[in-house]
Amino acid sequence: RQWSRGLGDVYKRQLLWGGSLGIFCGLVGGKIDDVVMRIIDAFLSIPWILAMLLIVSLLGTTTLVLIPALGFFYGKGIVRVARAATHDVIAKDFIVSARARGHSNMSIIWNEILPNVRDAIMVEGAMRWSWMLLGFSSLSFLGFGVSPPTPDWGLMISNARGLMSFAYWAVLAPIFGLSSLIIGINLTADAFAKALGIDRSTKAPV
């Protein structure tokens, strides 16, 4: 179960790096914001599956390679969401007041911006975490993910394909497990968004 714990850790890591960079760019603006976002746009234009195939061909298919790489590619969209949420917040009067009182950017981020954008970032991160789980299993199904004896639903589905004619349940069981987990995460994230009053239909394009 080491890889499953790693996928849980990478959820926090993608929130940390994506949220931090997005908040920073949204606050400072200017040329730094433009340069960083153009770099993010360039990475977003690259199909994740092609990038992952290149990475595993160069660095291997260990969880130490797969999990951080997936966390990076699925965390890029959080940068845009955090940046858009920060733009909405910095126009508020309490941000103007904090700047007038001489608060540093770090103080404004920690005390004023983060509490107001945290929920949107967490909801987006949960949705992307479910996509990352699907991506991880897809790589294993194609033979570019983890190898036995590491347990993985994509690997189980791939190994059981030859049993479809007489033992279809060997394929259906991991499909059901993976689907249930992904749907459960998405439904939980949607419920969380509704409870917090977050309209995901108007979030920043990613």
Describe these PLM feature segments.
Residues 12, 35-39, 54, 67-72, ...:
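Residue-level signature of the transmembrane alpha-helical core
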Residues 13-18, 26-89:
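Generic hydrophobic transmembrane alpha-helix motif, especially the helices
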Residues 14, 52-57, 67, 141, ...:
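Hydrophobic alpha-helical transmembrane segments of polytopic membrane proteins
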Residues 3, 187-206:
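Short cytosolic juxtamembrane segments of multi-pass membrane proteins
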Residues 1-11:
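Single conserved hydrophobic/aromatic residue that forms the stacking wall/gate
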Residues 50-54, 62-67, 71-75, 80, ...:
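Non-cytoplasmic
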Residues 29-33, 37, 90-91, 95-123:
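Amphipathic cytosolic juxtamembrane alpha-helices at the membrane-cytosol interface
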Residues 9-17, 106-138, 185:
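Transmembrane alpha-helices
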